[in-house]
Amino acid sequence: MYPVDLHMHTVASTHAYSTLSDYIAEAKRKGIKLFAITDHGPDMEDAPHHWHFINMRIWPRLVDGVGILRGIEANIKNINGEIDCSGKMFDSLDLIIAGFHELVFAPHDKETNTQAMIATIASGKVHIISHPGNPKYPVEVKAVAQAAAKHHVALEINNSSFLHSRKGSEDNCRAVAAAVRDAGGWVALGSDSHTAFTLGDFTECRKILDAVDFPEDRILNVSPQRLLSFLESRGMAPVPEFAEL
């Protein structure tokens, strides 16, 4: 459906089941041109050590025509928008996703959740907010979408939220998509794969986007070039190997 997937986990997050090589093979099979590995930040109980993220610099950029982005799904830690990504980790990473996870930041009231999410957006350290429609973390959706548009941060529609986790996300995600549409911001689609078999599956995301008539020209996954232009506008140095994507 789209040639870019921006959210997935490998065996480095020990509740996931596929390797980098598994994802490359599945990307080739499905025609995915560019994907980001985004294992959980180190404050999660079963997450990789911070050296895992620093050492991503040894990865090839391109394997058999498939581009690989070095990423993290960091954890929002507090109302000040601090995340568990710092120092040399930033030097090795292309894509910083951040979101709420109960083991790191327990659910709070809507005002507190909103304060934490907007502070994270405004920090300048994050490219995408993961699963902002999670019903366990109610937020002021309009305010979050406006902040995201202002700071050039995408809000994610997460396919896994409608299948395996975060039950009851549908209404919230429709509200998120509509608010991003009205604010003129960006949406990022993530399979949130924990196994390579679901790489590039945005079937449920598409239903959400269609329900609110979301414009294609505000979806980062439409092409590698669009996603890379977005990242470069946020300060990522151009990657010569990606020119052929």
Curated annotation (Swiss-Prot):
What is its EC class?
hydrolase
For this UniProt entry, the molecular function terms from Gene Ontology, in alphabetical order, are:
phosphatase activity; zinc ion binding
User: Pfam family of this protein, just one?
Assistant: PHP
Which Gene Ontology terms describe the biological processes this protein takes part in?
bacterial-type flagellum-dependent swarming motility
UniProt signal peptide: none
For this protein, the parts annotated as crossing the membrane are none
SMART domains linked = POLIIIAc (SM00481)
Q: Would you identify the family this protein belongs to, as annotated?
A: Belongs to the PHP family.
Protein's recorded name:
Probable phosphatase YcdX
